[in-house]
């Protein structure tokens, strides 16, 4: 690694730590010529995923586009930007795990919906209403009723013994 201070190519790693999520390694280095200390980060370089749109056009997966959708859904809700950033990273990791080169845009929408359901119910309803193109109040009521039913069932399912 080239020293950022003097340009020398030889250094020594004095400390390495893995990030909490296990995707990045932080390394403290010292230049063997000038003793300047600096930090580097090492990550796996993933192949770029392409998004297949409804009209079969393809474009690069855009992290910012996913984040904008989450931010819009969570507008004026008690959800931190850190939580939304984590959700985007989780979505992208899941997409890379499940798809090699291309991912349908509908799959991204489903992942966003899953994350929002766990983060904030109002944000979930906002996003789903646009994603599924709700056209009347009945569709909102139906979705909310389904959410309530799911909320009642989930705690019961967790207590059932596995046979």
Curated annotation (Swiss-Prot):
GO terms for biological process: negative regulation of DNA-templated transcription. The keyword Transmembrane helix does not apply. InterPro entries: ATP-cone_dom, NrdR-like_N, RNR_NrdR-like. PROSITE patterns: ATP_CONE. It comes from the Bacteria. GO terms for molecular function: ATP binding; DNA binding; zinc ion binding. Binds 1 zinc ion. A zinc finger (unnamed) spans 3-34. Residues 49-139 form the ATP-cone domain. Keywords: ATP-binding, DNA-binding, Metal-binding, Nucleotide-binding, Repressor, Transcription, Transcription regulation, Zinc, Zinc-finger. Belongs to the NrdR family. NCBIfam families: transcriptional regulator NrdR. Negatively regulates transcription of bacterial ribonucleotide reductase nrd genes and operons by binding to NrdR-boxes. This is Transcriptional repressor NrdR. The lineage of its organism: Bacteria, Pseudomonadati, Verrucomicrobiota, Verrucomicrobiia, Verrucomicrobiales.
């Amino acid at each position: 690694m080239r020293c950022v201070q003097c340009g020398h190519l030889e250094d020594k790693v004095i400390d390495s730590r893995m990030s909490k999520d296990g995707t990045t390694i932080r390394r403290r280095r010292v230049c063997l010529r000038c003793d300047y200390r600096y930090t580097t980060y090492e990550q796996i370089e993933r192949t770029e995923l392409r998004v297949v749109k409804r009209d079969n056009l393809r474009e690069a997966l855009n992290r910012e586009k996913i984040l904008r959708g989450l931010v819009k859904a969570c507008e004026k809700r008690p959800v931190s930007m850190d939580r939304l950033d984590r959700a985007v990273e989780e979505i992208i990791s899941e997409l890379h795990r499940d798809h090699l080169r291309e991912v349908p845009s509908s799959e991204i929408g489903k992942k966003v919906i899953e994350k929002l359901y766990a983060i904030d119910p109002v944000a979930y309803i906002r996003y789903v209403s646009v994603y599924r193109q709700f056209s009347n109040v009945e569709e909102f009521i139906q979705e909310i009723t389904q959410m309530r039913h799911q909320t009642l069932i989930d705690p019961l399912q967790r207590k059932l013994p596995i046979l």
